[in-house]
């Protein structure tokens, strides 16, 4: 948990300064912005101009890393990100993803065929209003297409200048190694938060060995760890959480002790629960860059409020001891 290996740098391209980290050789702000919620993944419909303003506000607050995907919307998130960052495109890094059958009207079907990847990339470039993608992910491993073939396409796209770095999302250690051997990966994305720690044992050793960065999505536990959700919350069917075991009425009630623990530690550190949850992640490894998402300007300000305060090794151990006493439901 030492900070000694942390690449301490500052982002001087926006009005607020934020520490930067490296995903292999890709330098980004220590926190990125996940741009999935703004297209209604958790219910609700959001005004385009409001979301453009939110993305630009994130940049003003020091965020230089924006995460999207062709399947978000579909297409809408990429379009909004592209329009929002156009005035300062060269000052930010965009991560997007391919791997689902969006153009075939099958957004849940996996598709990483080489010809499909190329069409997806051309579409993303157009929607993002750019000539290159800073970080291109395979959204999910396609069992019908060898990862070595996907990596080969990534190598070609890199040589063509259409993408600068590539990554994988929700990939196993074995797939990561196979792909990395063909075209070195810069980042792997997976769910990771205080209450979801599988990556620590499944892929962290591989990432550390190969020098690959890690980009956790849902670092705030889909808002559960922020303290705004209690055991009485119920989710509309349009909200993705309505289908998740961790958000059933029984699980919410059962898991409330974790919220209490996070609140206690947040108070102890003089931060909000959301800030503590991000602080916990940033303190784990120097090569982790979480991408919380939000549709609310006030919440955005909260997320970027603490990016250079860390937990000590002793504090991490103390928190984990207390956490280990809580049995979670729905995991």
Residue spans for each PLM region:
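N-terminal binding-site loop/beta-alpha segment at the start of enzyme catalytic domains
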Residues: 8-93, 328-331
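Conserved beta-strand positions
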Residues: 33-35, 68, 135-138, 168, ...
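A short acidic, helix-capping loop that chelates divalent metal ions and anchors anionic groups
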Residues: 37-42, 101-107, 299
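Alpha-helix N-cap and loop-to-helix initiation/capping positions
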Residues: 46-50, 76, 80, 108-116, ...
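Active-site groove signature of glycoside hydrolases
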Residues: 125-143
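Beta/alpha (TIM)-barrel catalytic core signal, keyed to glycine-rich beta->alpha loops juxtaposed to Asp/Glu
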Residues: 141-330
